[in-house]
Structure formats: C-alpha cells, structure tokens
Amino acid sequence: MSFSPLIRQLIESLRILPGVGQKSAQRMALMLLERDRSGGLKLAQALTAAMEGVGHCRQCRTLSEEELCPQCADPRRDDSLLCVVEGPLDVFAVEQTGYRGRYFVLKGHLSPLDGLGPEAIGIPELDARIRDGAFSEVILATNPTVEGEATAHYIAQLLADRGLTLSRIAHGVPLGGELELVDGGTLAHALAGRRPIS
C-alpha cells in the first residue's frame, strides 16, 4: 500500500521519536487520522508551543521556559553542591530524592564512536560553571554505563587539582532487591563499593 505524501510525511515525522519504527509510526498516524483528529490537532498545538517556548536554563542547562529554571532561581538551595547529570530527566529523578544543591546538565555522555567528545556534551561549559561558582563538592551522577563511567572519569581527571570533593553516585543492589536476582556486574559494583557499618 502506498500512502499519500501528507501521510508519508506524518509517518516519517513520528519515526524521529525514540523506539518508534516504521510500523508503529504507521499505526499512530492512521489512528490519529481515522479515530482522533481532535487529539492529533491538540498534539500538534502542544508540540508547536513546546518547541517555541521551551529553551535551556542559562546556568544548569536543563529544559526551562524561563531564563533560569526553578532550581537555579531558588535562593534556598545549597550553593556548595553541584550535581552533574547527563540530561534533563536525570534532574527530575535526582529531585525526587530531596537533593537541595545545584545542577549542571550535560548533553549526554562521551561517545567517540558517535562523534560526542567533551565539547559536544558541554564539558567546557561545566568547567566554566565550576570556576565561576563557590562549589566545594561535585557529585558525578552520570549513568552507570560504560559511557557514563568514562564521562565521570574524564570529569574527575579534569577537576582533580581544583581542591574540590569529587564524589560518584553509588551503584549496586536495589533497595528491597534479592541477591539471587541481581546480575553479576551490579553485584560486583556493590561489593567493590561496600562501606563500613557505623
């Protein structure tokens, strides 16, 4: 079956979403056109508004509709702590823990195979933010992947002589998890990162 040019354009546009392949995009496009045109128009309006109205916070670089995001605009936050994360969703996740320091959002992680070096993910901007701030501790909260670990290591090397406390988020057995269900790599990290009981 051959789709009309407008339907093909809609399908191709939907395919830019993560995890959406050709078949899923076709199903979504046809569902919107056949069953929920008002929902499709509402989606188009919300997408246009977000693309035009959402930018990046000038301090931490998370997504924001204002020049400063709510976390950077809050004077009650701890200016001595800086948490470095890979993306805006990570800020949301860390906020759920009650963390009250500042953030810096990278644009992903180092990935030379994908052409993502230090400049592409914002390491020079991080360096400038740390130089301009009054931070005493930098928390490296990149993901526990090979690329996330490499990114944390690179940043730690860059900041090693600054007189800052550098810390890495812990990895290991999830709270409430059972050891027999934990994979070997995760358990090895948990054992290597063990700490004394006080």
UniProtKB/Swiss-Prot annotation:
SMART domains per record: TOPRIM
Zinc finger (C4-type): 57-72
Keywords: DNA damage, DNA recombination, DNA repair, Metal-binding, Zinc, Zinc-finger
Gene3D superfamilies (UniProt xref): 3.40.1360.10, 6.10.250.240, RecR Domain 1
GO molecular function: DNA binding; zinc ion binding
Bilayer-spanning residue ranges: none
InterPro entries: DNA_Rcmb_RecR, Rcmb_RecR, Rcmb_RecR_Znf, TOPRIM_dom, TOPRIM_RecR
SUPFAM superfamilies from the UniProt entry: Recombination protein RecR
GO biological process: DNA recombination; DNA repair
Keyword set includes Zinc: yes
All copies of domain Toprim, residue ranges: 80-174
Protein's job: May play a role in DNA repair. It seems to be involved in an RecBC-independent recombinational process of DNA repair. It may act with RecF and RecO.
Similarity-based family: Belongs to the RecR family.
HAMAP family the UniProt entry points to: RecR
Name by which UniProt lists this protein: Recombination protein RecR
Protein's gene: recR
